[in-house]
From Swiss-Prot:
Family named by the database record: Belongs to the UPF0102 family.
A single GO molecular function term of this UniProt record: nucleic acid binding
Pfam families (alphabetical): UPF0102 (PF02021)
TM ranges: none
Name assigned to this protein: UPF0102 protein Moth_0988
Lineage, uppermost ranks: Bacteria, Bacillati, Bacillota, Clostridia, Moorellales
Gene3D superfamilies: 3.40.1350.10
Length: 120
């Protein structure tokens, strides 16, 4: 991953976490890593655990951010969520998957953020 891409991802994740916190989500983990991979943000909203994939884009050349979460990525996130819940003694807890789409302008400043609740 190039430095520009990594930086873009960090900007997007920071913007997403700030918006989520302002919207009543309680951030539990950022960049949760386990043997199966990584979840960008794990949060709670009420009694529900929310697994959040952050997608940051500066153009629509390759589609919208939410369109980039394909079937393969969804399956991986479901497996990661099951692992997370099991490792935290939360198996059976209600959960959902949100996608946060972050748009950057040409100067890599946040131009927009959208939360897609229950994206899959």
């Amino acid at each position: 991953m190039t430095m520009t891409r990594r930086r873009r991802g960090q900007i997007g994740e920071a913007a997403a976490a700030a918006l989520l916190a302002d919207s009543g989500y309680r951030i539990l983990e950022r960049n949760y890593r386990c043997p199966l991979g990584e979840i960008d943000i794990v949060a709670a909203q009420g009694e529900e655990i929310v697994f959040i994939e952050v997608r940051t884009r500066s153009s629509q050349t390759f589609g919208t951010p939410q369109e980039s979460v394909d079937g393969r990525k969804r399956l991986r996130l479901r497996r990661l969520a099951a692992y997370y819940l099991g490792s935290r003694g939360l198996a059976g807890r209600s959960c959902r998957f949100d996608v946060v789409a972050v748009w950057l302008d040409r100067q890599e400043r946040v131009a927009g953020v959208e939360v897609i609740k229950g994206a899959f």
